[in-house]
Amino acid sequence: MTGAVGAVAAPRHTNTTAGAHRIADAFARARAGGRAALIPYVVAGYPDAEGSFAAACAAIDAGADLLEVGLPYSDPLADGATLQRASQGALAAGATFESSLALVGGIARARPRVPVVAMGYANQLIGGGDGRDRARALAAAGVAGVIVADLTPDEGGPFEAVAAEAEIAVVYLVAPTTAPDRRAMVAARSGGFLYCVSLVGVTGARTSLPPTVAKLVREVTAVSPVPVAVGFGVSRPAHVRAIARAGAAGIITASALVDALGPDGRDVGSLSALVAKLRAATAR
């Protein structure tokens, strides 16, 4: 007697998770308002736990639709000088992975309507295993999604699986140098949204963005089943306006906000004012 061999179920996509649905709802609210979603970035633990909590809440209150929280790391390869300085400052002030998640949990409880997306690196979030414990810890803290800056879909399958178990989305990145066919593949694997890097290089506020950014946004959006959010170099209302009008679903701003906090990292009023100006420029 022979028995039928059942088909092996395909791994669950992280875009079907509860976290991805929360992210989708945030993008949908912005779209219903005729604008792109604004996604400010803060570094967990910079200048210290209290200061970063204040900055996060101020960014949300000034108009954030989602919030990206960077987990401080000793070797942040994708970060420019501003974010490296903030990350080093957070570590010097005693920030750890655990304290960063405690901070995220506090933000999620204080401002529950705005999804939090954590950003880190593979050594932090996966290490030598599959990242299951870290994914569970992120979910327990209230994180909706996670960006692993140096993880590609080619190597990300095991982490996607444990993230799906934990109900959080795994957000991937594409760059101007990513080949068109690969952009489509990465977009198909990304959960929550797709992070479109606007320029070649590391993060950091720029006075201008590449003239090709609008074309890049249109091309990436055309092949992405999830919302496309554009980051790197976005620091001015004119940048936000141009990216929104090119059709991006979301706009990420990071270094400019850390700069706005001033030398001591505590000028929350200036950060709030900048977020409000950027939010006002998100209309399509």
Predicted regions and their residues:
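N-terminal amphipathic alpha-helix/helix-capping segment at the start of soluble metabolic enzymes
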Residues: 1-39, 104-109, 218, 283
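Active-site-adjacent beta->alpha loops and helix N-cap segments on the catalytic face
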Residues: 19-30, 49, 74-85, 92-105, ...
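Hydrophobic faces of well-ordered beta-strands that scaffold small-molecule active sites
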Residues: 38-42, 67-69, 116-120, 146-148, ...
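Conserved, mostly hydrophobic/aromatic
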Residues: 40, 59, 67-70, 138, ...
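Glycine-rich beta-to-alpha transition loops that act as phosphate-gripper elements at the mouths
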Residues: 43-48, 119-127, 152-153, 174-178, ...
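Catalytic cores of alpha/beta
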Residues: 49-58, 178-188, 224, 230, ...
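Glycine-enriched alpha-helix->loop->beta-strand junction motifs that scaffold or abut catalytic
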Residues: 63-65, 138-145, 164-171, 188-194, ...
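Glycine-rich phosphate-binding active-site loops on the catalytic face of alpha/beta enzymes
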Residues: 64-76, 143-155, 196-204, 233, ...
